[in-house]
Amino acid sequence: MDKQMLFVYNPKAGKAQIRSNLLDIIDTFVKAGYEVTAYPTQAPGDAVKAVQERRAGYDMVVCSGGDGTLDEVVTGMMKSEERLPIGYVPAGSTNDFANSLKIPKSMLQAADVVVNGRTFACDVGKFNYNIFIYVAAFGIFTDVSYGTPQDTKNVLGHAAYLIEGVRRLPSVRSYPLKITCNGEVIEGEFLYGMVTNSHSVGGFRGITGQNVALDDGLFEVTLIRKPTNPLDINNIIRALVDKRVKSEHIYTFTTEKLKVESEEPMAWTLDGEFGGDHQSVVIESWHRALEIRVPDETE
């Protein structure tokens, strides 16, 4: 009897690449012994619902789209009692998590990894009652991904995120915060903060720290303190471009859990999508909670 696969895909992700590759991708799955049920998402949040309601009776769930689509599929799986391995065929404009896992950019090669690769257990982030895969962030740049028009993302790729972020510099605001982690309390005004489990964010590698492991139960945390003048802002941008993750205004550390409190509700982004306004959040690592298909050579 053939193995059963639920294939959830976003037909609009990236440059709608899935349209020209869909039949070949499904053919790859079928030749590997899977009976495939294809489900094109119709609206934001649709993939969460599809996985929760339809996963029963399947051996694997595969998704194709950007990081947002993967986030929805993982969220649906993590909220289910029975968890299945997940395959990922990237089709977005910036696929940070796929890059960290060395999943090929070629959709057909990624489909081959789904059926011929190996299963890797990696960490998943909890954000209050929500779930994220590789980044939770606030402040400057955090609304760039969901605030950048889809057409711009498609044409410019991850350069679109940097362009949009730089455009917003004149209106930068800071946030008075209290951050509790590792038995310490950090207080101050911050321009930006990100809690990551990835080798890259926004398509830029090396800005999340050194020796990053996706299955060690630890987040890499980066905080950028409030600059006092335009020169400080330039120095911060230069440090990020040069991948100097520790400087006068940039504070980094690792932790498995932290609490972030602000004086008023603050906008967060989860995996590049709007994560809501929150005044108090607890972020913790769900150690090796996600089983995902990766190439054999991925360590």
Predicted regions and their residues:
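Glycine-rich phosphate/pyrophosphate-binding beta-alpha loops
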Residues: 137, 194-210, 274
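Gly/Ser/Thr-rich active-site loops/lids in small-molecule metabolic enzymes
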Residues: 152-159, 200, 205, 209-229
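ATP/NTP phosphate-donor binding region
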Residues: 1-64, 299
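ATP/nucleoside-binding phosphotransfer catalytic cores, i.e., glycine-rich phosphate-binding loops
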Residues: 181, 187, 213, 223-299
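Short conserved active-site loop signatures built around small residues
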Residues: 47, 67, 193
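Short Gly/Thr/Asp-enriched flexible loops that form oxyanion-binding sites at enzyme active sites
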Residues: 69-81
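Catalytic core of DAGKc-family lipid kinases
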Residues: 32, 41, 79-195
